[in-house]
């Protein structure tokens, strides 16, 4: 849990400093605050005498809490190799049990060994994931996930030490007996009454909370649900201006150059919730709430998630999170094994909500560094991201003339399964799909305009009214080049939830590389007849970048927006692509039979900025 700058654990950080603390600062009088330098993502911690660390997933950070800790910051990462050359005598990658790093400035880090040179006996050969470092009872606590292995369930463990560098004394067993649900990603928080709680959980089972014992080594048996299952993991809580902010991550963490992992936020005035997003939708709701906050923005960084937040010595908030580099996604010699370097960016509070760099998203240019030490001042300033402003309408179809003029079919379905009626276009959902080599779904298409544009549709899709579970039945928009190259924004049923999915498929691809990747955006319309509609919008812009070309690059940026009321919009992630003159705008209703999708209108507009 992120806290203020006093002697309390504040978590976070990592990213490569290109120009560290300015040397001129050393010449300033002691009474004058020293300005920090600049840095550029990613962080690449040094290995003394032996290269740099290229992956630091699920980072957790703490400022040293004792005088003997030398005002250093301490960083802990999930079990992974340090880089592609980190191999044993047999040539196998070495998996470190929570690699540990130190820094005086939060940007230049040094590898200091592993928290556990030998894994605890109860962990045996399993991975030790998602460390959580905290301090209370005059000692350090290092919580971690024991990954599933050979039929043993995932569980939460803990070790203690007088020093943030250990040696660590492991409890030797789990904090509580797992029940088969995913018991991942520990996060320790303190409520308004001073009671500590352990947040944990992932997609299978959702995020839950248990009361932590006074000694920090066990929990109560009662659980409080924090988020609905089948959506979030990686909980991180920050207390800011009387509100608890819950940061959580969603989708696939590790899908190489199509990783669309992203971070969302909700807030509550009680630690145990309920947490709601900026639109007032609960993160426990079936039409899952969550305001996008750390999302890919079209530069090289994808998979921006599992973050931690902290406040620096100048009162500026920051976050550290892992990502994937679209140009260099895998460990060397291990195609399919995604590297996750750590990134550092500023959190700017806008109208009571956190934004990353004022809404600009993950940075890939020089940034002002945080104030890591007493007396430092950061030069970071809030610069709000420009908004996508819709211009004149290029064309609009209200589906009220019975003709579908201007549209054509890719694989026309039976004429009894679609049509116009009562001012909507209806289409029965099909037991068909557009997914890798399964390409039998019907797509209603028309040509996309030239230049920058936005397409918006109002969609009704009601599977949750009929209960659970109708997995991956979906309806919505596509930007369609062909069956193997498209962008898709749909309202989709996933187990007991309804979500908005923003996906990309490409082909052909190199051997071992992915063809399909998917992220999620904001909440859908409600799960009742009273509020059934979801608004979907894709904004297309041209943005040339010669460093982002090839199969996973391109000069076109596609950004997703969703709304559950047509007035308040959530801006989601951005995919980069190159569909060119072959791009068409399409409608789909697929993934399973038994439902009817309804489109109230489709409108294409110019985009101004």
Segments the model singles out, each with a brief description of its role:
Residues 36-68, 83-85, 107-134, 149, ...:
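Surface loop/turn signatures of beta-propeller and other carbohydrate-active proteins
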Residues 207-270:
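Aromatic-anchored, glycine/proline-accented short structural segments
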Residues 2-35:
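Secretory targeting and sorting signals
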Residues 260-350, 530, 539-597:
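Aromatic sugar-binding interfaces of carbohydrate-active proteins
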Residues 103, 216-217, 256, 267-270, ...:
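Short edge-strand/loop segments of extracellular domains
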Residues 85-89, 95-97, 151-157, 205-211, ...:
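Structural motif
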Residues 57-90, 112-115, 123, 128-152, ...:
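Hydrophobic core segments of beta-strands in well-ordered, beta-rich domains
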Residues 354, 360-609:
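Extracellular glycan-recognition regions
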């Amino acid at each position: 849990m992120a806290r203020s700058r006093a002697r309390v654990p504040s978590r976070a950080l990592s990213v490569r400093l290109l120009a560290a603390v300015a040397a001129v600062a050393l010449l300033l009088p002691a009474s004058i605050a020293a300005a920090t330098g600049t840095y550029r993502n990613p962080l690449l911690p040094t290995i003394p005498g032996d290269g740099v660390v290229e992956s630091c997933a699920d980072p957790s950070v703490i400022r040293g809490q004792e005088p003997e800790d030398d005002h250093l910051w301490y960083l802990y990462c999930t079990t992974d190799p340090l880089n592609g050359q980190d191999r044993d005598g047999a040539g196998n990658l070495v998996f470190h049990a929570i690699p540990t790093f130190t820094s005086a400035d939060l940007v230049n880090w040094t590898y200091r060994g592993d928290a556990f040179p030998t894994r605890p006996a109860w962990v045996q050969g399993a991975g030790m994931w998602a460390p959580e470092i905290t301090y209370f009872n005059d000692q350090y606590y290092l919580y971690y996930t024991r990954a599933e292995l050979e039929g043993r369930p995932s569980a939460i463990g803990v070790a203690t030490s007088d020093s943030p560098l250990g040696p660590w004394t492991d409890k030797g067993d789990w904090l509580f007996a797992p029940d088969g649900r995913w018991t991942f990603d520990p996060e320790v928080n303190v409520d308004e009454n001073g009671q500590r709680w352990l947040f944990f959980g992932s997609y299978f089972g959702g995020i839950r909370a248990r009361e932590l014992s006074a000694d920090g080594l066990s929990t109560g048996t009662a659980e409080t649900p924090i988020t609905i299952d089948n959506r979030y993991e990686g909980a991180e809580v920050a207390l800011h201006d009387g509100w608890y902010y819950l940061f959580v991550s969603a989708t696939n963490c590790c899908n190489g150059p199509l990783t669309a992992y992203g971070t969302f936020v909700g807030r509550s005035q009680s630690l145990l919730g309920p947490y709601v997003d900026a639109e007032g939708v609960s993160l426990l709701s079936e039409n899952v709430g969550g305001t996008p906050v750390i999302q890919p923005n079209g530069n090289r960084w994808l998979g921006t998630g599992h973050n931690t937040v902290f406040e620096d010595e100048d009162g500026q908030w920051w976050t550290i999170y892992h990502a994937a580099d679209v140009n260099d996604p895998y460990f060397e010699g291990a195609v399919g094994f995604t590297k996750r370097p750590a990134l550092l960016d500023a959190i700017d509070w806008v109208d009571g909500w956190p934004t990353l760099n004022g809404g600009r998203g993950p940075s890939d240019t020089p940034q002002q560094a945080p104030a890591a030490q007493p007396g430092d001042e950061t030069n970071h300033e809030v610069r709000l991201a420009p908004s996508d402003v819709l211009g004149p309408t290029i064309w609009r179809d209200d589906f009220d003339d019975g003709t579908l003029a201007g549209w054509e079919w890719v694989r026309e379905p039976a004429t009894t399964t679609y049509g116009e009626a009562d001012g909507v276009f209806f289409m029965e959902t099909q037991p068909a799909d557009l997914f890798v080599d399964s390409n039998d779904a019907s797509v209603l298409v028309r040509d996309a305009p030239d230049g920058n544009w936005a397409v918006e549709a109002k969609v009704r899709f009601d599977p949750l009214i009929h209960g659970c579970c109708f997995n991956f039945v979906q309806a919505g928009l596509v930007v369609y080049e062909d069956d193997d190259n498209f962008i898709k924004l749909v309202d989709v049923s996933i187990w007991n939830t309804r979500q908005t999915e923003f996906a990309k498929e490409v082909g052909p691809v190199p051997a071992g590389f992915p063809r399909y990747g998917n992220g999620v955006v904001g909440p859908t319309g409600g799960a009742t007849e009273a509020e059934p509609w979801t608004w979907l919008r894709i904004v297309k812009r041209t943005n040339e970048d010669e460093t982002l070309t090839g199969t996973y690059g391109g000069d076109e940026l596609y950004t997703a927006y969703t709304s559950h009321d047509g007035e308040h919009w959530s801006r989601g992630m951005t995919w980069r692509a190159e569909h060119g003159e072959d791009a068409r705008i399409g409608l789909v209703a697929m993934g399973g039979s038994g439902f009817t999708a309804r489109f109230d209108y489709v409108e294409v507009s110019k985009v101004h900025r």
